[in-house]
Curated annotation (Swiss-Prot):
The keyword RNA-binding does not apply. Its EC number is 5.1.3.6. This is UDP-glucuronate 4-epimerase. Catalyzes the interconversion of UDP-D-glucuronic acid (UDP-GlcA) and UDP-D-galacturonic acid (UDP-GalA). The gene is lpsL. Keywords: Isomerase, NAD.
């Protein structure tokens, strides 16, 4: 098949594009190569993808509709996967406008593109952050998600709502997946695992927020990609509605639209995560304990039942194994 993927120079987009290329598909990657973190890392990812004859890279910002249209002309996509976004909860406190530009205006342009070319399936990346102040644990897709705690989460929730309206109005089969703390090789330098490994290696203190009492449903990148690949083949329709007394399918009654969590449902305490990193590095961290930061939540915890019902797949790579793979990659590259 032919794919247009936004964000292929980013962490998740790179891994998804590589998987699809390895499977023999044609991929056009669209990325703004923004300097939110080291552009050299993005260039290295793109160079790896460019080794495949089935990959074409287009550089452009999501806000630039003409550039996005050009990428679509090259791709002639059967499937669009929209992964590009301004990410990072804490950075959204410093530079909220970039989140509106990328996550709202950019996503609107992707939706307009889908309206124009009518792909077989449109898939969009959202986040567990949309659950916000929801106190019900674990998080199921049908749970209340109306009190976002950051502009990042608010823009992602807004994208979900816009996507539903486009699916309804223009009959675009659409799946939104909510990610849960993705980690692994080639990850972003601003994420906890990368920051902790780098700090411990160089004898710098690590900053542990919430006094270490938080937990996260860490999802290894290969598991996430497997979940996405399987969902690509599950085009939302009444034919695959999940009918169950225990699973609430989010398939809309008014549109070919569905929201699916991609998370393992096995949250890990932050201190246990730190101890795992220490064990892999053979070195104890210098710990700087800090209070909860604005926008943070105490826990994330996915209910993966809908993903399992639709695809037969559940994230399965344990944190110990995932951290080991990241540390091995880091030591080889840094």
């Amino acid at each position: 098949m032919r794919y247009l993927i936004t964000g292929t120079a980013g962490f998740i987009g790179f891994h998804l594009a590589k998987r699809l290329l390895d499977d023999g598909h044609f991929v056009v990657g669209f990325d703004g190569m923004t300097p939110y973190y080291d552009v050299k890392l993005k260039e290295k990812r793109t160079a790896i993808l460019a080794r495949s004859n089935g990959f074409k890279a287009v550089t452009g910002m999501l806000e630039d509709k003409a550039a996005l249209d050009h990428a679509a002309e090259l791709a002639e996509p059967d499937v669009i996967v929209h992964l590009a976004a301004q990410a990072g909860v804490r950075y959204s406190l410093e530079n909220p406008r970039s989140y509106v530009d990328s996550n709202l205006v950019g996503s609107f342009n992707v939706l307009e593109l889908a309206r124009s070319i009518q792909p077989k399936h449109l898939l969009l990346a959202s986040t567990s952050s949309v659950y916000g102040a929801n106190e019900k644990i674990p998080f199921a897709e049908s749970d209340k998600a109306d009190e976002q705690m950051t502009i990042y989460a608010a823009t992602k929730k807004s994208m979900e709502l816009m996507a539903h309206s486009y699916a309804h109005l223009f009959h675009i089969p659409t799946t939104v997946f909510r990610f849960f703390t993705v980690y692994g090789p080639w990850g972003r330098p601003d994420m906890a695992l990368f920051k902790f490994v780098e700090a411990i290696k160089h004898d710098r203190p690590i900053e542990i927020y919430g006094e270490g009492k938080m937990s996260r449903d860490f999802t290894y990148i290969d598991d996430l990609v497997e979940g996405i690949v399987k969902l690509i083949g599950v085009i939302p329709s009444e034919e695959n509605r999940v009918v169950s007394d225990t699973i609430s399918d989010t398939l809309s009654k008014n549109a070919p639209f569905r929201i699916v969590n991609i998370g393992g449902g096995q949250p890990v305490g932050l201190m246990a995560f730190v101890e795992t990193i220490e064990a892999m590095l053979g070195k104890r961290a210098i710990r700087h304990m800090l209070p909860m930061q604005p926008g943070d939540v105490h826990n994330t915890y996915a209910v993966p039942d809908l993903l399992v019902a639709l695809t037969g797949f559940k994230p399965q790579i344990e944190v110990d194994a995932g951290v080991r793979r990241f540390v091995e990659w880091y030591q080889e590259n840094y």
